[in-house]
Amino acid sequence: MAGGEGGVTLGQPHLSRQDLATLDVTKLTPLSHEVISRQATINIGTIGHVAHGKSTVVKAISGVHTVRFKNELERNITIKLGYANAKIYKLDDPSCPRPECYRSCGSSTPDEFPTDIPGTKGNFKLVRHVSFVDCPGHDILMATMLNGAAVMDAALLLIAGNESCPQPQTSEHLAAIEIMKLKHILILQNKIDLVKESQAKEQYEQILAFVQGTVAEGAPIIPISAQLKYNIEVVCEYIVKKIPVPPRDFTSEPRLIVIRSFDVNKPGCEVDDLKGGVAGGSILKGVLKVGQEIEVRPGIVSKDSEGKLMCKPIFSKIVSLFAEHNDLQYAAPGGLIGVGTKIDPTLCRADRMVGQVLGAVGALPEIFTELEISYFLLRRLLGVRTEGDKKAAKVQKLSKNEVLMVNIGSLSTGGRVSAVKADLGKIVLTNPVCTEVGEKIALSRRVEKHWRLIGWGQIRRGVTIKPTVDDD
């Protein structure tokens, strides 16, 4: 993860150079060439029924397989989001018909390469760099998207062509998209190689009828086969043409939500060769730079002699930044960014920093131990198929003293409901969280041994604790 000397990226000479000396954040856009050469700036969620081919589609577009972890669900808290970045190119030869003039490649591909299509001339040029956020399950997806652990700009809704539409969860996915207020949706009719043309047409009509009156009404429906990579370039074209470039805030103080963290040192490493911990997450706003002093909140959490919670923020410095395998000198919102720091690696190993917020020193929000929220409950549980027993799927009201799982940013923590009336509730958190008034949180309840999403809330106010700082 070699950072450049003197604020210039030295790695990957085939990518655009980043120079901190000439960086002017006020001029950056999500399409600035020196940004999209090395990192993604648009996040696209993939939503769809289990085994309808979400990961396969992501792999077909980006070449990256997002399922990397066997123990995905072991601790019921860290649900690993799979991120995969893809560069989308367009051929600059006007005689080349669409959609063949669009192409997608992995994120370390050069920004320009000569055409290999017979009868065309010119180069494929980089037009977009997108990150696909591949979530394991839809209630997790909703919790993740709801609480803003990942900024979503658009969604791909997958429907398998060899099954009837709608499947039971598909309507919930649409509900999820509505709750998220995602405006830009592409519907992919996958596995088209497994059905006859008449079946595909019939299902196309079903999909049209199904999305009528929902947020997805009018969304393009693209027949594809992810396995055979059929029509993938059409998906690329629609991503470029139908998904507008989102407005991003590059000038505020930077803030990153940590969704992974690790210790990159091998066992038996010499003391002098130890590297600091690495945090991975998505930047919500602002630009992080190599060499910048940073603060991580809530930091190290402990209890004093009276059992009261104490937080000690971690102060450190960024030594390197990277997106997938690309070195960065500065990182903007979009995709998953790895931040190499000087933090003690034991604090970062095995995702210990998940749920923390990293940003500029003195610019991070308060640390809360209790929240007062206005909340909304879903009418029925997601993903529970109950034909006979309608009551089981209905979401019961919040009751005093029950324990919920609360997702705030990337932190999942227990929360005890200490008071509740109409649509307001007070929640005492098991772990302190760095957040601010107005942020959205997701609420889940234990139903038949599983955490199920039951609603979401918005922070009105809360009880904060003052972080302790060493006097050295």
Curated annotation (Swiss-Prot):
Region (Interacts with Cdc123), start-end ranges: 457-469
Entry's localization field: Cytoplasm, Cytosol
G4: annotated span: 190-193
Catalytic function, reaction form: GTP + H2O = GDP + phosphate + H(+)
Tissue specificity remark: Widely expressed. In the brain, high mRNA levels are observed in specific regions, including the habenula, anterodorsal thalamic nucleus, hippocampus, hypothalamus, and cerebellum. Also expressed in the embryonic brain. There is a differential expression between males and females, which is tissue-specific. Females tend to have higher expression levels than males in the brain (cortex, hippocampus and paraventricular nucleus, but not in the habenula), as well as in other tissues. The up-regulation observed in females at the mRNA level may be due to the presence of 2 active copies of the gene.
Modified residues (Phosphoserine): S16
Entry coiled-coil feature ranges: none
Pfam families tied to this protein: eIF2_C, GTP_EFTU, GTP_EFTU_D2
Enzyme Commission code: 3.6.5.3
Boundaries of every tr-type G domain copy: 39-248
GO BP term, example: cytoplasmic translational initiation
List of residues that carry N-acetylalanine: A2
Molecular function via GO: GTP binding; GTPase activity; methionyl-initiator methionine tRNA binding; translation factor activity, RNA binding; translation initiation factor activity
Region G1, residue ranges: 48-55
Residues the entry annotates as binding GTP: A51, H52, G53, K54, S55, T56, N190, K191, I192, D193, S225, A226, Q227
Presence of the UniProt keyword Cell membrane in the record: no
Note: Encoded by an chromosome X-linked gene which escapes inactivation. Has a homolog on chromosome Y (Eif2s3y).
Function: Member of the eIF2 complex that functions in the early steps of protein synthesis by forming a ternary complex with GTP and initiator tRNA. This complex binds to a 40S ribosomal subunit, followed by mRNA binding to form the 43S pre-initiation complex (43S PIC). Junction of the 60S ribosomal subunit to form the 80S initiation complex is preceded by hydrolysis of the GTP bound to eIF2 and release of an eIF2-GDP binary complex. In order for eIF2 to recycle and catalyze another round of initiation, the GDP bound to eIF2 must exchange with GTP by way of a reaction catalyzed by eIF-2B.
Name the record gives this protein: Eukaryotic translation initiation factor 2 subunit 3, X-linked
Organism: Mus musculus
